[in-house]
C-alpha cells in the first residue's frame, strides 16, 4: 500500500489489516471489469501436448457463466458500498469509485477532474467507505 494511512482503529473499529484487505479488494475492480468485458467465449483451441488426456466432462459455458456472475457480484459490492458511503451526495459517486479503484489516486488528482467537495469532506467519506467495505467482505 503506497503511502495509504489505515483508518483510526478507535473510531472505526477495524484493524490496519482489515483496512488493507478492503483497500486491496477495491484495487482489483478494474481487473474484474476488464475480465468481465473480455471473457465472453468458451471456445478455446485444443492444446496438443502429445500426452493422452481425459475430458473433464465439465460444462465450459456454465463455468464461464458462474465466473462472470461472481465477477459482477464483486463489482456490485464495491459500487453499492460507494453509493452507501456517499449517501445523498450523488455527484461524489463517480469520483469516489474512481479514487478507491485506482492505485496511487490523490485528492489533488480528483480536484483537477472537478470533484464537487473539499478535502476534509472527501477524506471523511473515503474513510467511511473503507469502514463499510471492510465490514462487507
Where in this protein do the model-derived segments appear?
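Residue-level detector of well-ordered alpha-helical segments, enriched
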Residues: 21, 28, 91-95, 125
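Short amphipathic alpha helix immediately N-terminal
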Residues: 87-105
